[in-house]
Structures are given as C-alpha cells and as structure tokens.
C-alpha cells in the first residue's frame, strides 16, 4: 500500500509541475467572454466564498453569473450527493457558456465503484475510478452546452497529507483535461501562484501593496478566507475575461 501511494504521488508531482506553473490562458479561452456570455460557478465548499466573489467581479463587468455550491460534497460519495445529476439540472437551468469548477477538496476518502466495490484511497484502483469521475463531470458540463470549462486546481494545503492529496488530485485534473475531446475546451487555473509566496509552500497571510497583512486562508488550512476568495476571483477574471 505504501509503495502504491508513493508511486501515485511521484506521478502526481511530475504532472502537477506542468499544471501548477499555469501558462497564460490561450487566446481561444477568452473568446467566450467577448459577447458577454453567461457564466456559472460550480463546486463544493471551496466554491462557497469564491463563487460569490467571482460573481461580483463578472457582474461589475456586465456579465450574467450564478453560483451553485454544496458544502461537504464531492465525487467520492455520490450516494450522499449526486453531483452528476446536480450538474445536469443546474446547467439546464442556467444555460451558461463558461463554467468555473472546483471539486475535490473533500474527496480524500474511500469510494465505491459502479459494481459496489469499495476502493480505498491511495490505491491505483481509486485513482483510476476518481479520474473517470472527474472526466465524467467535465463531459456532463460540455454535453449541456458549455463552450469553456475553467477548472480550479486545489491550492497549497497546510498539512502534509492534504498537500500530497492536492498534488495527486491536481495531476488527475490535468490528465482528464488533456483528453483529446476536452483539451481545447477545459482550461486549468492554478490558485497556488496567487495564494502562496512560493508555489508549493502554504502560507496563511500575504502582504497587500499597501503593506497590510491579509489573511487569505481559513483556519482549517484547506479553504480560502473571504480575502483569499477575492484574490482568486480578480486573478481569474483578469486572466480569462479581461484584456
């Protein structure tokens, strides 16, 4: 088991090195913004504050924007909250062209596959099944008319175990976004470069240009504070919507 987890994390770090460096958004990613097309923010508890902050930024620029977030949910326990059904119904109601997603913060746990087998976190089987779920979430969004998905990678985490998990899941995001049917439609966005003095190293505070210490992370070392959410919202909208 330890060897399996180690191999998974090594692969995650290798892949995530590409994703976390975050190349500037390709020009076609910004095309959807040109005609003031509607946007939707979807996610777990990580999206609760971010969604509202992104909405505020977009609405200030004249875009239609809505948010749906579900605290404590994820793709590991679909028996508790069926994200695929929720994505489908929310997409049909909101009819967005651009969708911003964060899912995964709560999924460091065992999951059950379609055959009823319990797959323990840290196994190759877990990684394969979880990757399929990430890919399916992307596909459901695209099948419902979205032209662009902006998938938010997990930020740096305070605890070592959570940081390793974030590295692993970010690598899975990158793998699924690179699938040929998705690669020109799904764009990854690294929160780490905006929330850490050194990407890969957790920090709770950043200094504002005015020299004020800003608390950017929640006390749990996982979620963002309201100030952190505002930082990500501005960076995201600047990158994908603004010239």
Q: Which functions belong to the PLM regions below?
A:
Residues 10-17:
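Hydrophobic h-region of N-terminal signal peptides that target proteins for export
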Residues 55, 59, 63, 92-95, ...:
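Sec-exported extracytoplasmic/periplasmic mature domains
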Residues 156-243:
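Catalytic His-Asp segment of secreted/periplasmic serine-dependent ester chemistry enzymes
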Residues 48, 52, 56-59, 85, ...:
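Solvent-exposed, polar/charged alpha-helical surfaces in well-ordered, non-transmembrane soluble domains
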Residues 102-108, 137-170:
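Active-site segments of SGNH/GDSL-like serine hydrolases
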Residues 20-21:
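Boundary of Sec targeting at the N-terminus
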């Amino acid at each position: 088991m330890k060897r399996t987890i180690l191999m998974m994390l090594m692969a995650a770090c290798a892949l995530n090195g590409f994703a976390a460096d975050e190349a500037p958004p390709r020009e076609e990613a910004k095309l959807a913004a040109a005609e003031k097309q509607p946007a939707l923010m979807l996610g777990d508890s990580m999206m609760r504050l971010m969604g509202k902050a992104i909405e505020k930024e977009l609405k200030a620029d004249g875009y239609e924007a809505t948010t749906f977030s579900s605290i404590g949910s994820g793709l590991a326990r679909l028996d508790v909250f069926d994200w695929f059904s929720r994505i489908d119904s929310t997409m049909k109601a909101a009819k967005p062209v651009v969708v911003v997603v964060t899912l995964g913060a709560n999924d460091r746990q065992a999951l059950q596959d379609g055959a009823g087998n319990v797959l323990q976190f840290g196994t190759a089987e877990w990684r394969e099944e979880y990757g399929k779920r990430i890919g399916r979430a992307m596909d459901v969004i695209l099948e419902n008319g979205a032209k662009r998905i902006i998938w938010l990678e997990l930020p740096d985490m305070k605890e070592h175990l959570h940081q390793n998990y974030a590295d692993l899941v970010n690598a899975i995001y990158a793998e699924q976004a690179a699938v040929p049917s998705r690669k020109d439609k799904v764009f990854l966005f690294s929160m780490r470069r905006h929330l850490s003095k050194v990407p890969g190293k957790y920090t709770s505070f950043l200094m504002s240009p005015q020299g004020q210490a800003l608390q950017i992370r929640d006390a749990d070392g996982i979620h963002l504070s309201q100030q952190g959410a505002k930082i990500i919202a501005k960076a995201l909208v600047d990158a994908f919507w603004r010239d």
